[in-house]
Every structure is written in structure tokens, then in C-alpha cells.
């Protein structure tokens, strides 16, 4: 399998991995909300004084539940991203090895993944003592073994500058305020408790089956928007780990790669900035890197020294390449049950847009163990 083929296969698989993590966090959030909604429905049987007292208790329960969710979700993200960083570090190493001319793969220096990496990604403050930018330590890192650890905490924040921990906490606090305002205003305006609960929960049921898209579609005011935000945070963080792994391998091997190509082929609703950057070549540490925005799926490709011209002349999109392959390769990349879906998208949209539509509609999931079985960990080779 070629270096470019592996890159896009990896991007599709990471999308499925982010679906898996998002679904777990979304279901936990929705369970917390539904617990409170069930308590809210009991207010109808109470008199006005008891109703006010009970409402305060219900809102306190929501705050406690969502604060607990934020804490447990932060820990879950630490565990998930730690494992993912190990896999992606190995994958980025193999990508550079396969792009080099024959006989040079063994000279690629690898990156050690620190056990404290995930804590840095999820909780590190940009101004925390001891946190150093990647660019600040470029010379040191070029001559010494790289440890992917707390020194990268500053770089691994979300596009708005927040850490994952901050994003989850602020989202929980905001939704408690919105829920409280919605319920209180509804009661003041004479709306029935039943109508209020339908508005905040939508048609969502406990243990709701289906993809994350279908769960969001069934949700109400207290779940649909937060569920979308959870998915955006997870997807952005997963892509950031992958992108940073690519960058670290380049920093550790400056004599092997001097440039990278920005690749935005899998961005379904490609932003103006990613569309403008797609296919452009930049020197390492001097150009833009993903994620440029929330839910960004763009990646970078490290270009081996001396092959800049050949890499810059590659114009075939991944959709075009994939459509020319036999069905076995298509099944390996897309999944054994999705070949018919792919063929239908190609007929309707053409191969380039078909791959983007496919990723957008693909609600399937992969956990870390399944990613390993797909060949990303060294232990699975």
C-alpha cells in the first residue's frame, strides 16, 4: 500500500475512531440530562411552593451530574488520546519510511511517546510553568531523542485556545444555565411541564440506538447542540494528535524532510482556508498546520528531501485513485459492507466529491483495539 493511500485510509479510520469516542461521551451526557428530565416531569403533581423547592433540587442535580460528566469525560479523553498518540507516532514514522527511496527506511528516527502526553493535551494551561512551544526547542529536538510530552501542552489546544478540560467544563456550565432559563421561563409563561420536557429532550429515549447523527436528530434543546459540540471537540482533538505526530517525526528527522504538503481532500464542507491551503507545499515550522478550525480533517504529508518536485506534481485526488482500484482494496479502505454505498455516491457526485460525502455519512465506529488491528500499531504489523 502506497504512502498516500495509507494517509487517506488512516484519515477515514480516524474519523471512525472519533465517532466511537464521541458516541460514548454523547450517551453519557444524554443519560445525565434524561435523569433530570424524568425528575422534572414529577413537578406537575406538586403545589406551587413545593414545585419551586423541587425545581431548585432538580437544577442542582443537573449541575452536579454535568460537572461529573465533564470530569469523567476529561479522564476518558486522556486515556483515548494517549493510546492514539502511540499509534499515530508509529504510523507517522512508517509514512516517512515508505516515502523514502529504497534502502533508507532504517535511518528514520522515531518519537518516544511519554506516558504524560494525554494529560498535557487535555489539561495543560498555555501559561503553565515548564510548558515550551515546539518551535522554541526545535534545535534541541533536532539533535536529541524526542519525547512527546508536557512540552507540547501549549500547542495542543483547541482552535479557540481552550484545552479539552476547559471546553467540557464551560460547556457543562453553559448548558446548566440554558436549561434553568428554559424551564423557569416556560413555567412563568404558563407552559406545561410536559411541553417543557419535550422541548429540552426532543424525541430522545434512554439508551437511544443509532449513529451519532441520528441521536442528535432526535434530541432536544438540552442534547442536540451539546452533542454536536462534543463531537466537534473530539474530532478536532483526534486530528490534532495525528497532525502533531506528523510534525514531530519531521522535527526529529530534519535531514530527511524539509517540506510538507497540506492535504484537505477529506474535508467534507471544506472551509475557505483549508480549500486555499490544499496541495500547497511549505517548509516545516514556517507554514500553517491542521486543525485550522473545529472538525478539521486536513492532514500534512512530510515530503522527503530531493522529492519535492515529484510530490508537488501529484494531482490525482484520493477519490479518483480509489475509484480505479479493485473491489478488494475498496472494501479494505471503506469497510466490507460499504462498497455499494460508495458506488452510488460515485455515480451521483463523481469520485472526488464521493469520498467527501462518504466520510460525512459514515457513522461507523472503531475503538483503539480495532485501530491496532487495522495495522497502525507496531505490535500489529
Feature map (PLM): residue ranges:
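N-terminal leader/targeting and assembly helices and adjacent pre-domain segments
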Residues: 1-216, 307-381
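Acidic, glycine-rich two-metal-ion catalytic cores of nucleic acid-processing enzymes
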Residues: 214-313
